[in-house]
Amino acid sequence: SKNSSCAGYASEELVEPLIFNQSARFMVVADPLDGSSNISVNMPIGTIFGIIRNTDYGVSSFNKSGRYYISAGYSLYGPSDIFVICVNNKVIEFTLDPEKKEYMLSRDDIKIPRTGSVYSINEGNFVSWEDNVKKWVLDNKNPTGSSNKRKTLRYVGSLVADAHRTL
């Protein structure tokens, strides 16, 4: 509608972005079903989205760096349904309460840990990685020195599930 705040929508599922109202304030980008190859093996899948300021009033507004995003987030569908959103530099998580049929705040002001014992990467792409990435992965598998601890690889092939584990 002409009163809509959404100017358009882009997704890897579409050949071209959809423009609804070129003068509206925001554009939405999404991967509606991330990890869809995991459906047949009953692994978690999700939806990834971002909301961008409509600065160019057309398709070129989709080609913007992260500083133009006013919000981003994901939904994770699995044993529990989780919705995570970043607004005003704050990451908040909600979990679906199946009895109440509403999302309840489950974590507030989430931060990515500085260190951890787990990493997530698709090792099938090892040959195409830059040398510093290869070295980092190999160092995590075979640490040297007393300060380095071995890290564990966890990768399911769903960006949403893998990123959520990191958070």
Language-model regions: role of each:
Residues S1-L167:
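IMPase-like, lithium-sensitive Mg2+-dependent phosphomonoesterase catalytic core
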